[in-house]
């Protein structure tokens, strides 16, 4: 294809998109870990004789046992061992022992920002939480009076809440306990009346509290404090003192954190040093003073908005890990203290004191089961990138879905350029999980910053470096959006400019603008920024599109879009799927699996490419070189493509010829009609790799064996297995085929009667093993691409009880078929309803058949008109042999820029091709199309173009499912649900109503009895079907018996009676449970209930 036409200056280069993960983990290694180790040092025993010091600054990490690929292959964890020099000091003898001790394994981050835990790639999602600090809020009481309160929230420790009441008294609550008078707390801190009055701007308001309560001395105040916090215990002064000390002034128990101290100083105008992380009496006085000023409404004070991003901060990997290390060290400290006390002080060494288990367990728990440690979404490079940039308000220390109201989920003006207003899940998590905007970064305090250009006298200073600002700093400035029009010198054009000022959207003159946003793309996330003509789409559809692009399956031959936004190369590069050259140099060697670059200085750099590996989502990860031997390579240039990338650009779908028209009702309700070409030419074919695993365990009756000798299996089924009973690589397998042969020893009890009979007659011991082989599940087929064998002898770590583990990888090519889900980039999704032969598809005047027919009714009501612009510009691109990069929000280049550009390009295409039908001025974008079946033209011209369509991961092959016989639920005896359990389809209450309405009584009876939970009836019915006899009358469903038992357990005398007839007068009770104890319940219907007599009957 020819070089791309630039319709807009390329968006300002984005920062490194995975930096948030990498920087955070680097901070943890350089500062966070040391900080934690030093805060626990020294640990003294209960008598104070022994001291153990951790020299945190000198900790060491040993090289990882396996590298990244090896860890994945062995199902291991990619981690390093942490060693810390420790010093044990015996105070009595003055003896000092120094030793380096092992304190645990620390999983290492890969260069792509992920962790490998037990062989699977995981991502730690960033958490967005309320920042520690002081928050003021106003509430109306039931009489409509405005009262104010303040909450002092630490990083960890007790909350302190100050409130005023209708009488103008000031109260304090400690950790949501009962109210205390504010003067009790202040006096207990040891402050005199004069000191208190000096610090308050309006002491007369506080005086009311003293008048009402009376004076307290310091001792009385401490006693009162103790009484309120520990009711029922005899109060003492020393107890009160100790309680107060430990609650607020002990750094172990109470910590504001760096951020909390910074926020407190900022809000209350204090100058307390950054290192003081506990509360001071000055803080408490200032907080009360601010509250009184709010209450008197004297200006200069305002209540806080908790949803403002200045009051919410991001906790990334480093900090989350640091908190977890603190938990582990806390447990470790307890153990060390106990060991110091119990053991003999002479024989003690640091190594015998420090047990790595608690720390290892805490870290393992965090990576293995924390809500924020997630299995990485590897469907395609974009999914991977977005996952690392995700912001979640859920998780430990965050919100819960049920408690989160509308305010928390809503878009806030301070989100501008920090959190994407569009990308969030649909459903219960909407608004709680967001995505970082493209240019946003997180500062040292954890607040999100976004860049702006400075404006001086109406001139945008793009020559200066952009200024990064937090939401707080930006509040009092007038900030214009990124798409304001400027002249060549940078002066803002126009007289009224839209700006954001103090959380409001207003207008102002160019001279009063303080800053301008860096780029129009700044406010949205990476996934959203890949939607061309985004400004013409409704936000709900843009949200669906952002989420669906992450579900696009990498195709066999990726193709980059004709119409893009210019951010595709960077998205691909930062996802880590493509390989870039580290230096300027020459490509000295290339083959399918390896690339070597020789730098100009002579150094050599080698890269091994990933070939056909399985991703977490069963898609295929594969890299292919795009350079040749002898080529020059520049630093940062892409030298190998990954899955779903082409020439270093993200390529999630295919450009195909699309028309918007109804066709015989096949595209009713968003259904999609496609041409057979997409199947034959493998346009939408993808490779999926499934993993099947089996382990040979040690059982009570002996070990299980992986073998070729499987009982009752013909030679035909074993032809693909090697001598050990394991399938060979390259074999084609279909459902039911054996992948790994395995036999399990079985005891006497689980032998069917015919085997017992044989042994009784011939006295021979039939081989007492059971076939327990790994077979291909229902509906799966493919080619075996890899087999891996793990045994203890090779030094592999196996699960307890397993002697051998075999893993088989089966790859399948999935062509597109009816039932698959497809989508465009504008939230236009649908299911394929029919695949037409090419000759029946509508065709263009030059005879080209269409690839796909979409319903035009999908556009107007959904208001995603961007798809129409895209398809027409794509059509022009194909005819002109050009690709377009269209940055969203293009009105800064003039009104209706999108429409004018598209029409101009289409008329240019008409001139170049010399085909007048390509573009008509009367009906722009519409073309006369002919019916492929009759050759007649359709009644009206149709919108035709090239759209970029994706195939999504919801494939019909993974969903289609049927059941004949299968497992039943234990209690209700009804079939289980779901494909994985080989379940049935639930015939629910409403479906029953439908059959009742039709009067289909017998079908309904069968559904509720023999097809479901009439245990005896279903076995009899199965036997009857096998023998071709009439199905007997159904019995009582098990669930009815369960219901009766439940009612009887509530002491209700409930039973079933046979109504009276002429033979006997009174009703007769029927015992439904009569046959329950006699029968042995088979988990599946069996044929054992056939008697010899039945078999004879058949021959009659």
UniProtKB/Swiss-Prot annotation:
The keyword Nucleotidyltransferase applies. It is an enzyme of class 2 (transferase). GO terms for molecular function: DNA binding; DNA-directed RNA polymerase activity; ribonucleoside binding. Keywords: DNA-directed RNA polymerase, Nucleotidyltransferase, Transcription, Transferase. Gene3D superfamilies: 2.40.50.100, 2.40.50.150, 3.90.1100.10, DNA-directed RNA polymerase, beta subunit, external 1 domain, DNA-directed RNA polymerase, subunit 2, domain 6, RNA polymerase alpha subunit dimerisation domain, RNA polymerase Rpb2, domain 2. Transmembrane segments: none annotated. Residues 1079-1089 have a biased composition (Polar residues). One of its GO terms (biological process) is DNA-templated transcription. The keyword Transferase applies. It catalyses: RNA(n) + a ribonucleoside 5'-triphosphate = RNA(n+1) + diphosphate. One of its GO terms (cellular component) is DNA-directed RNA polymerase complex. Residues 1064-1100 are annotated as: Disordered. Its EC number is 2.7.7.6. Signal peptide: none annotated. PANTHER family: DNA-DIRECTED RNA POLYMERASE I SUBUNIT 2. DNA-dependent RNA polymerase catalyzes the transcription of DNA into RNA using the four ribonucleoside triphosphates as substrates. Belongs to the RNA polymerase beta chain family. In cyanobacteria the RNAP catalytic core is composed of 2 alpha, 1 beta, 1 beta', 1 gamma and 1 omega subunit. When a sigma factor is associated with the core the holoenzyme is formed, which can initiate transcription. This is DNA-directed RNA polymerase subunit beta. It comes from Synechococcus sp. (strain ATCC 27144 / PCC 6301 / SAUG 1402/1). The lineage of its organism: Bacteria, Bacillati, Cyanobacteriota, Cyanophyceae, Synechococcales.
